[in-house]
């Protein structure tokens, strides 16, 4: 059974799921490593440690789930990013769908009565006072992280599973997606089912991972900044400065 030569489809699947198994395991254990967290905080100030620590994790994910598998698939099978839905093209219909669904997702998070629970996990950079630079780093690193994430799930995995049929491909994709969210709690694991179905459908409908990426990015940033606003131990430095300026202008001594 194991002596038969692998077909190109089988080699593709081995590369993709092997890369995911190794890459996600590496990311997960480093992300949850107390010793690594302590090492960052010993070497840098608290704010700088949080920025560098989270940037390291997200760039690692970008490499192990995006860059490395793409290099292997390209070098061994001659595949390109376009084969997995990473197409650089503009589509007004696609842009409109992304915009509407992003507003819906952000609105759902905004009106969610349980959004206070987000404070325990988001934003992942545990910084007391956020500057514009911190916000920019958060957005850029989340973007790189989720680009690799969606390329792996809705690009590599979905394409590799399509020979077994659309429903099998989508079902397995969602199952793995849910498993990846279990460490974040029951609510996120359950929410991964409809969200996973939606982004799989968008990917198949448009033949591109960009709708899934932009929608996932909107979700991640909404979680981050709504949680930041709800956390009494965190604040935006610009708001504090503007508030202080307002109080000075209203003071009789001004």
Predicted features by range, described:
Residues 62-68, 144-154, 195:
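Core segments of transmembrane alpha-helices
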Residues 4-77, 81, 86, 94-97:
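Alpha-helical transmembrane segments in multi-pass membrane proteins
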Residues 116-127, 148-172, 201-208:
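Membrane-interface helix/loop boundary segments of multi-pass membrane proteins
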Residues 2, 41-54, 75-145, 159-163, ...:
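Juxtamembrane helix-loop-helix connectors linking adjacent transmembrane helices
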Residues 71-75, 141-146, 151, 203-215:
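Hydrophobic alpha-helical transmembrane segments in multi-pass integral membrane proteins
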Residues 52, 132-144, 154, 168, ...:
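Alpha-helical membrane-protein architecture signal
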Residues 14, 18, 94-99, 136-139, ...:
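Hydrophobic alpha-helical transmembrane segments
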Residues 27, 32, 170-174, 178-180, ...:
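Functionally important transmembrane alpha-helices
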């Amino acid at each position: 059974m194991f002596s038969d030569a692998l077909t190109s489809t089988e080699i593709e699947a081995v590369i993709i799921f092997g890369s995911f198994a190794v890459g996600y395991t590496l990311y997960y254990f480093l992300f949850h490593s107390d010793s690594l967290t302590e090492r960052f905080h010993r070497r840098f100030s608290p704010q700088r440690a949080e920025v560098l620590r989270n940037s390291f994790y997200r760039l690692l994910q970008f490499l192990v789930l995006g860059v490395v598998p793409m290099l292997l698939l390209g070098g061994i099978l001659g595949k390109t990013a376009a084969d997995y839905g990473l197409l650089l093209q503009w589509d007004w219909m696609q842009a409109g769908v992304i915009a509407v669904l992003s507003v819906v997702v952000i609105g759902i998070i905004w009106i969610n009565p349980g959004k206070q629970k987000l404070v325990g996990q988001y934003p992942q950079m545990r910084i007391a006072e956020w500057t514009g630079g911190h916000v920019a780093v958060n957005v850029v690193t989340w973007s790189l992280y989720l680009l690799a994430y969606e390329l792996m799930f809705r690009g590599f995995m979905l394409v590799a599973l399509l020979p077994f049929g659309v429903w099998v491909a989508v079902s397995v994709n969602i199952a793995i997606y849910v498993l990846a969210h279990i460490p974040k709690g029951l609510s996120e694991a359950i929410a991964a089912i409809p969200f996973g179905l939606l982004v799989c459908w968008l990917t198949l409908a448009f033949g591109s991972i960009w709708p899934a990426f932009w929608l996932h990015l909107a979700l991640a940033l909404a979680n981050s900044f709504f949680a930041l606003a709800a956390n009494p131990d965190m604040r935006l430095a610009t708001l504090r400065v503007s508030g202080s300026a307002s109080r000075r202008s209203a003071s009789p001594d001004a």
